[in-house]
Each structure stands twice: as structure tokens, then as C-alpha cells.
């Protein structure tokens, strides 16, 4: 299914004009993507310090059912996208080694890293579907452009 990410990008760019708070920006992006495309779960995990040292992905703004709160570096699809610094498309989450099952209803997933001005990952956009193979490489450029709004 071809999704019109260009229109969503334009809508979000106008909506977020002048807004500097990253949590607000993440919340609006998650809401617009979720409502526009009817994804099952749409949200962000932020790179955050762990109390015992190091960093992890910590749940940020999202739309959908309750979610995992903490994701370790290089674990699951989100942690792997963070570690590899690249978008990961997973047609069938059951086939992804080390998949973290926050819900048995998630069947496919795409995770897009968010980079700061020096190229470090600061967050990931995680989108889940109840359908197998709901995402493809066709989704990558549009979603990467949208997260550049952060």
C-alpha cells in the first residue's frame, strides 16, 4: 500500500512551525501518523540515561495500547535500529531474532532512528501493524523525512 507521506510531512511542518519542544513535536507526529494511516501502535522511544549507568530507550509520546517502557541498547527491533543507526523494516516480527513482544497483536513493524545535528541517535519512531508485511522499503524515505522534523 502506497502511503502519501509528502502530504503528511507538509501538514506536520505547518502544525509544528515555531514549536521547539521535542516532546510536543513527537506527540503531534505520532498522533498525525496514527490517525492518518490507522496504524495499530505509533510512537517514540527516547534515548535516556539509566539510573545504574549507561543509556536505554525510554517510552515517549505514543498512540495505541500500553507499551513496553524500557528497551535495552541493541535489543529488539527498536534497540537494533538504534545500534545500527538505520531504519529497519520487519515484515513478520516473529521472524526477527530477539524481538521484544510488547503485544502478541503486533505482526509487522518499522523503526526509524531520529538523529541530532551531530548524527547521534536521540530517539526512534516505532510503528506496529496487526497485519503481516504492512511496511516495505517504500515507507522508509517518507518516514525518515517526517522524523527530520524533530
Q: What name fits each language-model region?
A:
Residues 1-66, 144-150:
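Intrinsically disordered, low-complexity terminal regulatory regions
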Residues 108-116:
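A short, aliphatic-rich beta-strand micro-motif
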Residues 41, 111, 124:
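Short hydrophobic/aromatic beta-strand element in the GNAT-like acyltransferase core
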Residues 115-129:
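Sensory-domain boundary capping and coupling elements
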Residues 128-146:
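Regulatory loop-to-helix N-cap segments in sensory/regulatory domains
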Residues 47-50, 56-104:
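Regulatory sensory and allosteric helical modules in signal-transduction proteins
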Residues 74, 124, 140:
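ATP/adenylate-binding site constellation spanning eukaryotic-like Ser/Thr protein kinases
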Amino acid at each position: 500500500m502506497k502511503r502519501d507521506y509528502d502530504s503528511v510531512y507538509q501538514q506536520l511542518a505547518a502544525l509544528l512551525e515555531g514549536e521547539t519542544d521535542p516532546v510536543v513535536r513527537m506527540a503531534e507526529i505520532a498522533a498525525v501518523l496514527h490517525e492518518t494511516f490507522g496504524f495499530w501502535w505509533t510512537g517514540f522511544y527516547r534515548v535516556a540515561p539509566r539510573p545504574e549507568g549507561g543509556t536505554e530507550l525510554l517510552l515517549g509520546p505514543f498512540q495505541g495500547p500500553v507499551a513496553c517502557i524500557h528497551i535495552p541498547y541493541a535489543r529488539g527491533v527498536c534497540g537494533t535500529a538504534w545500534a545500527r543507526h538505520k531504519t529497519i523494516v520487519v515484515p513478520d516480527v516473529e521472524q526477527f531474532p530477539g524481538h521484544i513482544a510488547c503485544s502478541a497483536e503486533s505482526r509487522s513493524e518499522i523503526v526509524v532512528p531520529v538523529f541530532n545535528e551531530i548524527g547521534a541517535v536521540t530517539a526512534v519512531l516505532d510503528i506496529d501493524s496487526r497485519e503481516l508485511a504492512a511496511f516495505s522499503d517504500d515507507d522508509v524515505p517518507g518516514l525518515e523525512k517526517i522524523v527530520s522534523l524533530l
